[in-house]
């Protein structure tokens, strides 16, 4: 549980004596040198809890500049590579539901022994994302630069792309009353489908395509980011189903494993529906029961 304010000499219900060492966790096999899982009594609510790393924090050769985003599985930071003098994006493994940041050391630790299994799964999934990105080499896919261990967890650094997400751009356009032109949409769709052509030829499915995971560079080039849900075609039978309402395909929404290129293509269609209308389509599982979503031809856009 997150730490709270208030300091005491000993945690409630304890004698103030040091607790026995915690049992081995097995995480050492994934992250050698990782601090041991804390005993429950060691997690007394003594300090103000801070989830994100502060600006100025050093991670290997990188210095944290600011927080870019925070989700259920981790935090992304804008950082500077002090050796190469360039900005990068760093992703930190920090599954919110089963871990916390030690307020004294900054280390990420499972909440308790019961959360250890979920934390281990999240860590393996995080490293799998890094390995997937390392297999890919395409101008429309974010490049991974390095993977490293710090603060008892895993990080990876990616290229920093100067651009804005389609989510932000779409919202901005609809707020101001502007629209994409037909030629702009055709060009964007063509370039995005070429990225998917390469990705699927590599036998990898993204599984989480949506406006927020597509960046548009200053030159107008789409770049696919966030491969946390991506899986190799041969590993889908062991993949956990992750969904985003409105953008996930019917097979994903129903928790099935028959994921394929068609799944990503459905999400692309949903993405462009959102760009045209200003909102995502109805959830796939709802549409399967009763598809009352009006076609674009009936919507004034």
Predicted features by range, described:
Residues 103-135:
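AlphaC helix of the eukaryotic protein kinase fold
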Residues 147:
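Activation-segment/catalytic-loop signature of the eukaryotic protein kinase fold
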Residues 151-165, 169:
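Conserved short submotifs of the Hanks-type protein kinase catalytic core
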Residues 166-180:
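AlphaC helix of the protein kinase catalytic domain
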Residues 188-189:
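Activation segment signature within eukaryotic-like protein kinase domains
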Residues 200-216:
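Catalytic-loop of the protein kinase fold
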Residues 246-299:
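C-terminal lobe helix-coil module of Hanks-type protein kinase domains
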């Amino acid at each position: 549980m997150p730490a709270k304010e208030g300091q005491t000499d000993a945690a409630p219900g304890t004698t103030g004596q040091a607790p026995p060492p915690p049992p081995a966790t097995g995480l050492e096999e994934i992250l050698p040198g990782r601090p041991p899982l804390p005993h429950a009594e060691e997690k007394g609510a003594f300090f103000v809890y801070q989830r994100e790393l502060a600006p100025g924090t050093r991670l290997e050769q990188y210095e944290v500049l600011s927080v870019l985003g925070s989700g259920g599985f981790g935090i992304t930071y804008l950082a500077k590579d002090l050796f190469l003098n360039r900005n990068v994006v760093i992703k930190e493994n920090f599954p919110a539901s089963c871990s916390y940041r030690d307020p004294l050391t900054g280390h990420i630790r499972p909440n308790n022994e019961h959360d250890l299994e979920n934390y281990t799964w999240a860590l393996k999934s995080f490293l799998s994302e890094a390995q997937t990105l390392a297999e890919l080499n395409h101008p429309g896919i974010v490049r991974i630069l390095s993977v490293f261990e710090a603060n008892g967890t895993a990080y990876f650094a990616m290229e920093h792309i100067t651009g804005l997400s389609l989510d932000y751009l779409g919202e901005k356009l609809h707020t101001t009353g502007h629209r994409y032109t037909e030629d702009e949409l055709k060009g964007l769709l063509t370039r995005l489908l070429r990225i998917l052509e390469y990705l699927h030829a590599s036998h990898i499915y993204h599984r989480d395509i949506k406006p927020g995971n597509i960046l548009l560079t200053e030159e107008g080039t789409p770049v696919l980011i966030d491969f946390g849900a991506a899986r190799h075609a041969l590993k889908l039978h062991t993949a956990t189903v992750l969904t985003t309402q409105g953008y996930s395909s019917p097979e994903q929404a129903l928790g099935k494993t028959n994921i394929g290129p068609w799944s990503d293509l459905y999400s692309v269609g949903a993405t462009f529906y959102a760009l045209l209308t200003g909102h995502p389509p109805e959830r796939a599982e709802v549409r399967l029961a009763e598809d009352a979503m009006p076609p674009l031809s009936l919507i004034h856009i």
